[in-house]
Amino acid sequence: MDVVSLDKPFMYFEEIDNELDYEPESANEVAKKLPYQGQLKLLLGELFFLSKLQRHGILDGATVVYIGSAPGTHIRYLRDHFYNLGMIIKWMLIDGRHHDPILNGLRDVTLVTRFVDEEYLRSIKKQLHPSKIILISDVRSKRGGNEPSTADLLSNYALQNVMISILNPVASSLKWRCPFPDQWIKDFYIPHGNKMLQPFAPSYSAEMRLLSIYTGENMRLTRVTKSDVVNYEKKMYYLNKIVRNKVVVNFDYPNQEYDYFHMYFMLRTVYCNKTFPTTKAKVLFLQQSIFRFLNIPTTSTEKVSHEPIQRKISSKNSMSKNRNSKRSVRGNK
């Protein structure tokens, strides 16, 4: 891994200041993966999102409706964390698949084994009235093959729009991965929100979380066009290929790899029910508790490549401009 000096990670898609055309040989790279990496990715993003709502006074007294929640192992950590902080939260976890038994027997957690449609969403809204709802969606349908097609994605995003329209949540975190240019079908709409990037996503994943806080007005929609799709692909490939493969040398932490740097900036915003001498001590405590919960071993920084000059990532693309390829990034998860 090469080294770099950075002040902060890219937290949101709009902050990515460079792009790179996809290189087909990337598909042959052996991906480095942690145990339970998918649960770790979800846990960090949702802990960051819910802590933000806590900071704004939105979380306490809410019902979290999580659609597409199974297996949901990580949700037990979230539930326990906010319960120990004295937050009064109810959880409704809905999925056609079964949940991890670790979620059984909790009075504040309702498990529903079914898929949602418009009629069921209306029944949820009626059942929970007048509670304020926080919506988390991780819906993912695949009608064939190993990865969702563009038709699958458009169906999922239409369903997420219906969720917002019917449930009228105070805030939402939605699954968002732009279709690939060579699989384009038509323009479509998604809710307006901040496109949060995810540490520990698969190596070439183009998935983000779409975070929104609603202030009473009607849901604002953003149109996604084919030119947007090309922009998404190039920026996410730059992030995954260049940025996420760096070691941040000015980051004083046991593991200086970029994803840990990204995680640090997420966890520093999280409230704890104990005091720490430094922000680093708090983040280490949180990381260790999360990794212990998910049975993820602690790792040190991967061996870095020799680089005589440590420099910040340039805002200008230093790669060749003649690397166009018709092949798309295939990190769907």
Swiss-Prot record:
Binding positions for S-adenosyl-L-methionine per the UniProt entry: 39, 66, 68, 72, 95, 97, 116, 138
GO molecular function: mRNA (nucleoside-2'-O-)-methyltransferase activity
Region entry Binding to Rap94, spans: 169-333
GO cellular component, one term: virion component
Catalysed reactions, semicolon-separated: a 5'-end (N(7)-methyl 5'-triphosphoguanosine)-ribonucleoside in mRNA + S-adenosyl-L-methionine = a 5'-end (N(7)-methyl 5'-triphosphoguanosine)-(2'-O-methyl-ribonucleoside) in mRNA + S-adenosyl-L-homocysteine + H(+)
Region called Binding to NPH-I, residue ranges: 169-249
Annotated segments matching region Disordered: 305-333
Main localization category: virion
Active site: 175 (for methyltransferase activity)
Pfam family, any one: PARP_regulatory
GO biological process: 7-methylguanosine mRNA capping; methylation; regulation of mRNA 3'-end processing
Alphabetized CDD domains for the sequence: capping_2-OMTase_Poxviridae
Main EC class the enzyme belongs to: transferase
InterPro entries to which the protein is assigned, alphabetical: mRNA_MeTrfase-like, Pox/kineto_cap_MeTfrase, Poxvir_cap_MeTfrase, SAM-dependent_MTases_sf
Residues engaged in binding mRNA: 22, 177-180, 182, 205-207, 233
This protein's UniProt keywords: Elongation factor, Methyltransferase, mRNA capping, mRNA processing, Protein biosynthesis, S-adenosyl-L-methionine, Transcription, Transferase, Virion
Protein location: Virion
Function recorded in the entry: Displays methyltransferase, positive regulation of the poly(A) polymerase and transcription elongation activities. Involved in the modification of both mRNA ends and in intermediate and late gene positive transcription elongation. At the mRNAs 5' end, methylates the ribose 2' OH group of the first transcribed nucleotide, thereby producing a 2'-O-methylpurine cap. At the 3' end, functions as a processivity factor which stimulates the activity of the viral poly(A) polymerase OPG063 that creates mRNA's poly(A) tail.
Family according to the record: Belongs to the class I-like SAM-binding methyltransferase superfamily. Poxvirus/kinetoplastid 2'-O-MTase family.
Protein name: Cap-specific mRNA (nucleoside-2'-O-)-methyltransferase
